[in-house]
Swiss-Prot record:
Name the UniProt record assigns to this protein: Mediator of RNA polymerase II transcription subunit 5
Entry's Gene Ontology molecular function annotations: transcription coregulator activity
Originating gene: NUT1
Superkingdom of origin organism: Eukaryota
Family: Belongs to the Mediator complex subunit 5 family.
């Protein structure tokens, strides 16, 4: 038997018997001594066996290749070259007419999943400094990457539909992952010493021309995949003049020193040890909850996994500690009860379900009781006293029940046994454990009894750990009702939600606003008036209730059209938000609009009520777009003496009926603007406003809707009226209106600061607002120097940083952060301060949240517009400063070093994990009693507890955990993986071993080497 035949038999047996990596390494050493073989031949044999099996994804194959690389038996460049030779990336799309021909051909094996894994292993090897060890190897890897890029670009061109410009790269998640992995590998290689030497040398011009041609083909496609990666490769192209043609020698000689010096400076910056400060997650969670809850399971898991690698025990402990710290800080700062509730709900309702989903997807077994015990031991005992301590304490005990609530929720989600609660508390709990809910059961209950939905919505305002299941059930029912156009039931659910703003906060802990509102907006936009042949008033009632919930979300969180799920410029909801509060000129109205306007004026002010004919001839959409014009014409007539005020008031009182009340949102908005803009006597408009804001009588059903309308409009009316009062200080008719509006002013949750807070920050000495941010930074560093001590957290509100960004801009705020980080570096706190600065930059921001989400939930630009960010973020500002590092390094090398370290760490934490293929884990999931959707992705809702986690987020959790460790090292900066190799290897091996188990790895005892041939 020849050497290659023996290796073929050996490798075939290894794959068939599911030999793990460690055993493969030992066995292959024996065979290498018996049958030495060339690396190319060995790889050919291994990859040919893979083709023969026809298996789409075998996790052992990349493991074997990685073992051979680490043993020094094959080089990375040879691996990449051989891998491409056998890759299905060369396959061309088959036309229908070629099916017969194809059936006669040997079916080729789909290899992209394996290709991605092997390339990511190469990426890890390069980023940790293991490869390349010589210039020749670096040249070989560059050449292989060039060939791979050209093959992927050719695949894209072959698979695109020229007639519709669809398909191509974006039609295949695996192709996108492969494409992105190649770019990151090229970036990592170009940042190594050997890589820089190759690119800087004049002796590799032919290679650089080919690389330039590959980059020129790669970069246009990269725009759709990863903008940071594109920017990095664009800098590489410009830095080394890689444009696919021989460079101008005189220009090249001028640029060489600059390029090499700049890159050598960055390569010379050494990273210190990574410290995860106590303040880091404390800042991050504060940022998630400071305004609109910015919670996305995929984003949060990505950040935490990048932060802690595979150390799930540390992750769980620190997240729990940070959330309790956030609650403690809120108590000391006297935050509102509404804010306290949101923090508490995040702790009790969100975290247990998030942990349960994370651990189920990762199949990691953790000593949760120990993790929770460690976290609780670090808490401030004055903020979270035990039941027995309450009686001996003089201060507030408002949070005394939080610890048992959290533990009961953990037990409900099967994270800990109920019997451990007493041990963790150190005493018998006074509460009884809540009953766990199951989403499917709740959906059935709602479908059977519509009143059950109202009960469940009210339970969202409790902290029993059931909110996830309730949110999942409520949103599923709402989506079904939208699809079925069952608007009567939908109306009651929308009314229940509109009158409970805190319930909306809880919903956003588990679902994005877009997930909730897109079906509602689509229903409102497509509402056909001729579909309902019954009475018009109930239809107005149902339409208004659904619209009011959309408006409640929009104004509470200052949502943009994208956040609402609006995709069409013809959307009724979009028109209402853009133009609804603006009156139209009569000349601009269509004939139909003029008729409708006349009919409504007649019904309100001349006839004895609103007739069925008036409503049936005017659809709800038409009415809402006419409301402000109706107000303008009526008020103008009254001011001109053509209409008595009592008649005006009496007519407008019809709008206080429940079926028309939501229209007051746009009407009051227009009225406030009209009063603020008018130069004439505002008496009549103010009296009108008074009658609508504080009506003399209103029905019980209408009272809750009216309160919601005031919640939505109060903030803008308050600002306008106070400005008018400053112009007319002697008027006595403004204060009564302000008094009515005052309780509604806290409705919005946008992360805006209070006036008193802003005054204290802007008057801070020295430095004003920026100085106060630096002072907060210093306090957080000091607090984090004793992370294990049970002490109160440093006073912090993320409103301060948000105010800085919104008022001064991210560039100035980042400069202040870098100034402080540089100072902390000089005083010996570099690593601790770096984590705090990085977290401030990585913390979610409402303005950029949709764009960040799109990295995890890709948007199809053919179906909906891409999200946009209206501000420069701190990360954008950091990227700009990083581009200036070459010049800065000559003037202020320490500051340049600080920026390089900051840039690396931010990218390491924020880089989304590459899209690894989803393993078929259905059998394991079923054994664990987890639900599996029809499409094979995990429904992260343990059947025993039944607490829902976002369906869209769940699809990504498993994939992200599979390759989390690789992502931590495979970021956009070549230096970010240094010093992390050992831990990362372990994590990857653990995950792949788990994957191997999924395909049925038996135990091997005393394996007979000879029996394998």
């Amino acid at each position: 038997m020849t050497s290659s035949e023996q290796w073929r038999a050996f490798l075939h047996q290894c794959l068939m018997r599911r030999i793990d990596a460690a055993e493969f390494k030992n066995l292959s050493k024996i065979l290498f001594r018996r049958c030495p073989t060339a690396e190319g031949t060995l790889l050919d044999v291994l990859l040919e066996i893979r083709l023969a099996t026809g298996i789409k994804w075998d996790p052992l194959l990349p493991l074997y290749i990685d073992c051979l690389c680490k043993m020094g038996k094959v080089q990375t460049s040879t691996v990449l070259t051989s891998l491409l030779k056998y890759s299905s990336i060369h396959d061309k799309p088959q036309s229908p007419s070629s099916e017969t021909v194809q059936s006669k051909m040997a079916l080729k094996c789909y290899t992209l999943m394996t290709d991605i894994r092997v390339i990511q292993d190469a990426m890890l090897s390069v980023s940790t400094g293991s490869t390349p060890k010589s210039l020749a190897e670096a040249v070989g890897i560059f050449s292989a990457i060039i060939d791979w890029i050209q093959a992927v670009v050719a695949w894209h061109n072959n698979h695109i539909d020229p007639s519709q410009q669809t398909g191509g790269l974006m039609s295949s998640p695996d192709a996108v992952s492969l494409f992105e992995s190649l770019g990151i590998l090229l970036t990592a290689l170009s940042g190594t010493g050997k890589g820089i030497e190759v690119l800087s040398s004049d002796s590799h011009e032919a290679l650089k021309v080919k690389l330039g041609q590959a980059l020129s083909a790669y970069l246009p496609l990269c725009m759709e995949v990863s903008l940071p990666l594109r920017n990095r490769l664009d800098s590489l192209q410009k830095g080394f003049n890689l444009y696919g043609e021989p460079p101008n020698k005189s220009l090249q000689s001028m640029m060489d020193n600059v390029n090499v010096n700049a890159l050598q400076f960055e390569a010379s910056v050494m990273d210190g040890p990574v410290i995860n400060s106590r303040a880091g997650l404390y800042i991050y969670i504060n940022a998630m909850l400071v305004g609109r809850p910015l919670v996305d399971d995929s984003m949060l898991l990505n950040y935490l996994t990048n932060r802690y690698g595979g150390h799930y025990d540390v992750l769980v402990e620190e997240v729990i500690t940070a959330t309790f710290d956030v609650l403690s800080n809120a108590l000391y700062r006297n935050e509102s009860s509404r804010t306290m509730f949101l923090f508490r709900s995040f702790l009790v309702n969100k975290l247990p379900s998030f942990f349960a989903a994370m651990l189920a997807a990762s199949m990691v077994s953790l000593p949760m009781e120990m993790c929770i015990s460690h976290a609780l031991s670090r808490l401030d005992p004055n903020t979270f006293p035990s039941f027995s301590q309450m009686f001996a304490m003089q201060g507030s005990t408002v949070l005394s029940e939080v610890r048992p609530e959290f533990l009961f929720a953990c037990a409900s989600h099967k994270l800990i046994p109920e019997s451990s609660i007493e041990r963790l508390l150190g005493e018998n709990p006074m509460q009884t454990p809540p009953v766990g809910y199951n989403k499917d059961d709740l959906v059935s209950q709602i479908n059977t009894n519509q009143e059950r939905a109202e009960q469940l919505v009210s339970e969202l305002e409790s902290t029993e750990g059931n909110a996830g299941a309730i949110v999942a059930a409520i949103t599923e029912v709402m989506h079904n009702l939208c699809n079925q156009k069952e608007t009567m039931t939908l109306k009651s659910i929308c009314n229940s939600l509109s009158r409970r703003p805190q319930a909306l906060d809880v919903i956003l802990l588990f679902r994005s606003a877009k997930q909730v509102l897109q079906p509602l907006c689509a229903l409102l936009d497509s509402w056909h008036w001729d579909e309902d042949q019954g009475e018009s008033q109930p239809v107005y009632d149902e339409f208004g209730s659904i619209l009011l919930l959309v408006l409640t979300f929009k104004y509470r969180y200052d949502l943009r059209p994208y956040d609402l799920g609006i995709t069409s410029n013809d959307s009724f909801v979009l028109k209402l938000l853009d133009c609804g509060s603006s009156s139209q000129n009569l000349d601009d109205l269509s004939e139909k609009q003029n008729r409708n306007l006349g009919a409504w004026i007649t019904a309100l002010f001349i006839a004895e009520g609103i007739s069925e004919e008036t409503m049936s001839s005017c659809s709800p959409q038409e009415f809402y777009l006419l409301v402000t014009t109706l107000f303008n014409q009526s008020l103008t007539a009254c001011e001109a003496g053509k209409l008595e005020f009592d008649t005006l008031k009496g007519g407008f009182e019809y709008l206080l009926e429940p079926f028309l009340l939501p229209s007051l949102v746009v009407a009051l908005t227009w009225l406030g603007n009209h009063i603020w803009e008018t130069e004439s006597d505002p008496t009549i408009p103010l009296k009108t406003l008074q009658s609508l804001v504080n009506p003399s009588s209103i029905s019980g059903d209408a009272r809750e809707i009216h309160k919601t309308v005031l919640n939505i409009t109060a903030r803008s009316l308050d600002e306008q009226l106070k400005d008018i009062r400053s112009r007319h200080p002697n008027r006595a008719d403004i204060k009564p209106i302000l008094d009515v509006l005052e309780p509604c002013l806290s409705f919005q949750r946008t992360g805006s600061c209070h006036r008193s807070e802003l005054d204290s920050w802007t008057t801070h000495s020295p430095g004003g607002l920026l100085g106060s941010i630096r002072s907060t930074f210093q306090g957080l560093v000091l607090w984090s120097t004793s992370p294990g001590v049970s002490m109160a957290p440093h006073s912090y509100t993320h409103r301060q940083l948000v105010a800085g960004i919104r008022m001064l801009g991210s560039a100035r705020v980042l400069t202040a952060i870098v100034d402080e980080l540089k100072m902390q570096t000089e005083t010996g706190n570099a690593d601790l301060a770096l984590d705090i600065a990085v977290t401030m930059i990585c913390a979610p921001l409402a303005e950029s949240f949709a764009i960040e989400q799109s990295n995890y939930h890709p948007v199809d630009p053919n179906k909906e517009p891409l999200p946009r960010c209206p501000v420069l973020t701190l990360r954008d500002a950091l990227n700009l400063q990083h581009e200036n590092v070459p010049k800065l390094s000559e003037k202020d090398p320490l500051r340049a070093e600080v920026i390089v370290r900051l840039y690396r760490r931010v990218n390491a934490l924020m880089t989304p994990t590459s899209q690894m293929p989803n393993l078929d884990m259905s059998n394991i999931i079923q054994d664990m009693q987890l639900g599996v959707e029809d499409h094979g992705q995990m429904d992260l809702e343990p059947a025993g507890a039944g607490h829902g986690v976002g369906d869209d987020d769940a699809a990504n959790l498993n994939r992200m955990l599979d390759n989390a460790a690789a992502a931590a090292a495979a970021g956009l900066d070549s230096g970010m993986g240094q010093g992390m190799g050992g831990g990362l290897d372990t994590s990857i091996d653990d995950v792949l071993n788990a994957a191997d188990m999924a395909v049925g790895n038996p135990e091997f005892l005393d394996l007979d080497m000879e029996g394998m041939f």
